[in-house]
Regions:
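Bilobed "Venus flytrap"/periplasmic-binding protein-like clamshell domains
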Residues: 2-36, 93-143, 147
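A C-terminal functional module that forms or caps the active site or interfaces directly
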Residues: 147-159, 164-166
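Single conserved hydrophobic/aromatic residue that forms the stacking wall/gate
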Residues: 167-178
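Glycine/small-residue-rich loop that forms an oxyanion/phosphate-binding "nest" at active or ligand-binding sites
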Residues: 59-90
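Non-catalytic, usually N-terminal nucleic-acid engagement modules in DNA/RNA processing proteins
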Residues: 19, 42-44
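Beta->alpha turn/N-cap motifs
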Residues: 49-51, 60-72, 138, 154-159
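Short helices/loops that flank or line small-molecule/ion binding pockets
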Residues: 37-38, 46-62, 125-126, 138-149
Length: 178
């Protein structure tokens, strides 16, 4: 019997691979296979879209997974999992950003994000009424083009926000093993 671990595609995959190498688990991230053998006969990996990992673990298709707290929260499945450990990789923060340092207080706030649950929770905690525009990419351009007052998005270095003259308030996000 083997254990199947769901790993995220994209920039986190290399960090996870390096972490696994430290404990003598190696695998080929360039493999075209859907389920990849590792150097440990008892362990296999599936490289999946990050947003799908909580579902694969929840339905028992994968035994464990690596996913960000942001994705886990957005999946609405966070109460179904135990966080086994914080892998201390993929350091980023959830950022509320706008073209100036003030969010309108006298009107409904137009917010662009691909994190609707987090966004609703944040603004609800501030007793702010929002009009939420859910986007899948290029979130940063929404206030520049005038379709939102602000954005809620993940930020790693803040370089893109700075280049676009966006000002942000942030909260840490971690990537646990679930």
């Amino acid at each position: 019997m083997s254990v199947l671990i769901a790993l995220p595609k994209g920039r986190l995959l290399k960090e996870v691979q390096n972490l696994f190498k430290k404990i003598d688990i190696e695998f080929d991230i360039d493999s075209r296979k859907l389920i990849i053998d590792t150097s440990q006969k008892w362990l296999k990996v599936a490289i999946l879209r990050t947003w799908d990992i909580p579902k694969f673990v929840n339905y028992g298709a994968a035994d464990i997974g690596v996913v960000g707290k942001d994705i886990l929260y957005e999946s609405k499945l966070e109460n179904n999992f135990y966080e086994l450990m914080d892998l201390k990789i993929g350091n980023c923060r959830m950022s509320l950003a706008s073209l100036d340092d003030k969010i309108p207080s006298n009107k409904k706030i137009k917010v662009a994000s691909k994190y609707p649950e987090y966004t609703k929770k944040y603004f609800s905690s501030k007793s702010k009424d929002i009009d939420l525009l859910i986007l899948k990419g290029a979130i940063e351009i929404a206030p520049i083009l005038g379709i939102s007052d602000c954005i809620v998005d993940l930020v790693q270095t803040g370089k893109t926000l700075k280049e676009l003259s966006l000002i942000h308030i942030s909260e840490p996000t971690r990537h646990p093993l679930i």
